[in-house]
């Protein structure tokens, strides 16, 4: 079974996605739900499909994903990263176009911590001169 399946782990913000690529017809299953029912936002669905559309493998694979943590945007980004890594494991020649599109690099931006004496990470209380 391992010969017919490719795996990739994707991360974004606090979300982690485990992605399995199997030969198929283009079904995308996330946490045992379809892509359309899992993501209400069209932008999130579009982000998930980006690496497949770039490599023209949309109808070639069935994708099974388990994703935990984060919110809608983080989970979509994590799935995209995982699909990219699984595609590279499937065919190393896809690395170059995926790298050019910026899908291979893990987006390292994280939420900045809240500081003591501030309302948020950088928002300060109003300053009064007198």
From Swiss-Prot:
Gene encoding the protein? rpsI
Q: Which family does it belong to?
A: Belongs to the universal ribosomal protein uS9 family.
Kindly list the GO CC terms recorded for this protein: cytosolic small ribosomal subunit
Lineage top rank: taxon: Bacteria
Question: What protein name applies here?
Answer: Small ribosomal subunit protein uS9
Q: Which organism is it from?
A: Ectopseudomonas mendocina (strain ymp)
GO biological process terms, semicolon-separated = translation
Molecular function terms, GO-annotated:
RNA binding; structural constituent of ribosome
A family per Pfam: Ribosomal_S9
Q: What InterPro entries does its record include? A: Ribosomal_Su5_D2-typ_SF, Ribosomal_uS9, Ribosomal_uS9_bac/plastid, Ribosomal_uS9_CS, Ribsml_uS5_D2-typ_fold_subgr
Check the record and name the SUPFAM superfamilies matching this protein. Ribosomal protein S5 domain 2-like (SSF54211)
**Keywords per UniProt:** Ribonucleoprotein, Ribosomal protein
